C-alpha cells in the first residue's frame, strides 16, 4: 500500500486487556502451552463476540486459550485441559469460546463453549464435565475502548472495523438470538462516532445486523463477507479507491428481529420471510449495493418469444466519473394468480464488468 506510506496512521483494536488470578496467584501460559498458576499473571486480549461468547488471546504468546478436545499425546494437553496453543479461533467446534459467569463476590466462573465450568486440579485447569467451577478474578488492566477513543481524537479520518467471527455464534448447529452488533462493538461505535464523526464503518460479516446507529451517526458503511484469503488487503484497496466495490446483498437486512417469525416456523409464505414475501420496511433489501459511481438504465425493450420466454434488452450507462461493475437485476411479479405468489422474485441477473465513465454497455437477457 504505497499510498499509505506518507500518512500518519494510528491503530487501536478497541479490546480490553485482562489478567486472571486464582487462590492468590496469577494465571499464565506455561512453556507447554497449558494454563498454570504463576507469581506474575499473563495479560490476555479479551474479545467479546456477543451472546455471551468470549475469546482470550495471550499477549505474550499470541495464542488463544481453549479447552482441548483430544487426549494427550506427548506434550499435547490432556482432554479438556485449558491451554493456549492455537493462533486463531477457527474450527468446526471452536473450543476457544468461553462464557463468563459473574459471581456475587465479584469473581467469575469461566465455562467452555459447551458451558462446562473451568476447574483446577494438580495438573492445571480443565473444562470437560459438569462440576463446580473455580472462582477466578478477571481484572481489566487496559480499557480498550478508552484507548481507541484517545487514538481517534482529532484525526482527519477514522476507519472503524466491526463484525463477526464466521464460526462463532452463527453457523451450522448454531443460531443467533439477535440481529444487533455485540454490545461492546455498539459501545465502541457510539464512543468513536461521538469523538470523531468523520468515521467510516468497515463491516466484516456473513449475516445481517441492525445498523440504525451507524446509519444515523456515520457518513458511510462498507461491508464485506469473510472468507477470502487476502480479505484485509482487498478491503483496504476498496476503501482507498484503488478499485470500486460492487457487491450486492444476498439476504434481506431487517430493521428489527421483531419483523421475523419464530425461528422454528419454516413456512416462508405464512411467516412473510425473505424479500419474496416480506411486506414491511427493511434496513437494506435483498440485492442492495452501492459503488463509487452511478448508473442509468436506458432504451428498455421487452419482447415475448414462444409464449414463455421474455427477452429484455437495455443499455447500462455509467453516469459518474469512476469505472465500476454494475449488477443488473430483473425481478418479476404475478399480478393475477389463484395461489399465493411472491411479491416479487429475482428472475435473472448479470454482472457487467468495469464500465468506464460516460460509456455504456448493451445487454440482452433471455428470462423464463
List the predicted regions and their residue ranges.
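Loop/turn elements at helix/coil->beta-strand transitions in domains of secreted/extracellular proteins
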Residues: 154-158, 196-200, 217-219
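Short beta-strand and strand-turn-strand segments in soluble, beta-rich domains
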Residues: 337-351
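Active-site His/acidic residue clusters
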Residues: 164-187
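Short proline/glycine- and polar residue-rich coil/turn motifs
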Residues: 351-360
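Secreted, periplasmic, or luminal enzymes acting at the cell surface/secretory milieu
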Residues: 1-13, 204-325, 329-333, 341
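Redox-cofactor binding/interface segments in oxidoreductases and associated redox assembly factors
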Residues: 160-161, 223
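Lectin-like carbohydrate-binding module/patch detector with strong preference for beta-trefoil
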Residues: 2-155, 160, 172, 180
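Conserved small/polar residues in nucleotide/adenosyl-binding loops
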Residues: 361-367
